[in-house]
Regions:
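Flexible, active-site-proximal loop/turn residues at the rims of small-molecule/cofactor binding pockets
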Residues: 16, 146, 167
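Single conserved hydrophobic/aromatic residue that forms the stacking wall/gate
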Residues: 165-174
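Conserved lysine of the Walker
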Residues: 57
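Inter-motif core of Ras-like GTPase G domains
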Residues: 158-162
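Short functional linear segments
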Residues: 1-52, 60-62, 66, 70-71
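ATP-dependent carboxylate-amine ligase catalytic core
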Residues: 22-29, 33-44, 70-157
Length: 174
């Protein structure tokens, strides 16, 4: 499978919030925890900064990553959504995840994750954490996805947490 076919597989086989709406949202962290266990808890191999809020998460995340990189750290950055290419979501020191890594990850792990029926965000989060661990980042800046206590990025144990402006609707009941 090449990169374009891998993306088609991901976009068409894994429920994606931008395409199917709230039905892509998975209640609970069971899939996230199963993926995390399968990959050996990769998020425990690097420090993390968790960024949440209503507006400005992406800008805040990119700024934090740039500051840390300038300070000499090897920095992972995980944001969503992407604007042009899927690889924008997962970066190390500003460089997008290689196409080959995305293809290899899906080909190698497909038999494990297909029966779980993870959401697009659950799977891409697992891919990001695995990539950051494989590439030995010092710190990863992780942008919250849909938010709330059941957001799959919440498995990280961040050193600092950053919240941008919060509005009342951001409580998500939790």
């Amino acid at each position: 499978m090449d990169y374009q076919n891998t993306l088609l597989y991901l976009y068409n086989s894994v429920p994606m919030f931008q395409q199917v709406g709230s039905s892509a949202y998975k209640e609970g962290l069971e899939n996230t925890l199963a993926l995390d266990e399968h990959f050996g808890h990769p998020h425990q191999n690097f420090h993390s900064i968790h960024v949440g809020g209503t507006n400005g998460k992406g800008s805040c995340s990119h700024t934090l990553a740039a500051i840390l990189q300038e300070a000499g750290y090897r920095v992972g950055l995980y944001t969503s959504p992407h604007l042009v290419d899927f690889r924008e979501r997962i970066r190390i020191n500003g460089q997008p995840i290689p196409e080959e890594y995305v293809v290899r990850f899906v080909e190698k792990e497909r038999d494990f994750f297909e029966p779980l029926h993870p959401s697009f965000f659950e799977l891409t989060t697992a891919m990001a954490f695995r990539y950051f661990a494989d590439e030995h980042v010092d710190v990863a800046v992780i942008e919250v996805g849909l938010g709330g206590r059941l957001d799959c990025t919440n498995i990280v144990h961040p050193d600092p947490v950053s919240y941008t402006h919060l509005r009342a609707h951001e409580t998500l009941s939790d």
